């Protein structure tokens, strides 16, 4: 599969980009997902208090435009992430400005590889302006990445927004935690909502360092 680039996720002061793509359907699957998590050991998770979580799930749709999954199933998954973050002592912010952490949920529609990345700025399958101009000039992983995102995976990421200086357009932000849930198949296989919720819960269970002090 060819690599896909994503355009900016958020536009400050404007509505989210619309998409003509269908929302992913949900049906039963067998077996739990394999959940892979990784984080920046230098990140001060305990010092963060607030987080911003959008009301849609980003999808790696066709073409160069970002697509958004917003139906009731998407809202169920977003609520699951909110419950996990709230349970760790963080408070959801209704405004992007001033939030300590940014939370991103992504549904992978095209298999992609991230192999041999050893830190620093990433110029691979995701556009470096993935978080949009509001978050700064781009983003990067401060830890090594070397694996594949398969079609149907759900990926969770936390970005440290405290590294963003208001008005500094060239500032790149660190992705300080990611969770990749594998187990969803391509083709006619559809996502099972219950399994995704369990994978989200497992992502946080094996990430005890995400905790407000």
For the regions a language model picked out, list residue spans one by one.
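Short secondary-structure boundary motifs at beta->alpha junctions and helix caps
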Residues: 163-202
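Bacterial lipoprotein signal-peptidase II cleavage site
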Residues: 21-26
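C-terminal motif of bacterial Sec signal peptides marking the signal peptidase cleavage site
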Residues: 16-19
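Envelope-exposed proteins and targeting segments
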Residues: 47-49, 99-101, 150-154, 175-177
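Low-complexity, compositionally biased segments in intrinsically disordered regions
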Residues: 104, 109-157
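N-terminal segment of the mature soluble domain
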Residues: 56-107
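Post-signal peptide N-terminal segment of mature Sec-exported envelope proteins
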Residues: 29-47
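Bacterial N-terminal signal peptides that target proteins for export
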Residues: 1-7
């Amino acid at each position: 599969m060819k690599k896909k680039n994503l355009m900016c996720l958020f536009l400050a002061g404007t509505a989210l980009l619309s998409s003509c793509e269908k929302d992913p359907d949900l049906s039963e699957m067998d077996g739990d997902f394999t959940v892979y998590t990784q984080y920046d050991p230098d990140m001060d998770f305990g010092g963060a208090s607030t987080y911003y979580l959008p009301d849609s799930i980003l999808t790696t749709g066709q073409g160069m435009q970002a697509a958004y999954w917003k139906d009731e199933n998407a809202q169920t998954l977003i609520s699951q992430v909110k419950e996990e973050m709230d349970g760790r002592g963080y408070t959801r912010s209704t405004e992007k400005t001033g939030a300590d952490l940014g939370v991103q949920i992504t549904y992978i529609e095209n298999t992609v590889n991230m192999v041999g990345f050893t830190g620093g700025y990433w110029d691979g399958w995701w556009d470096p302006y993935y978080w949009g101009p509001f978050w700064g000039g781009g983003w990067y992983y401060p830890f090594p990445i070397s694996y594949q995102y398969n079609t149907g995976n759900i990926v969770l990421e936390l970005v440290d927004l405290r590294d963003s200086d208001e008005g500094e357009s060239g500032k790149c932000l660190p992705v300080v935690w990611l969770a990749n849930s594998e187990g969803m198949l391509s083709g006619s296989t559809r996502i099972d909502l219950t399994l995704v919720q369990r994978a989200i819960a497992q992502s946080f269970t094996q990430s005890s360092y995400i905790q407000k002090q």
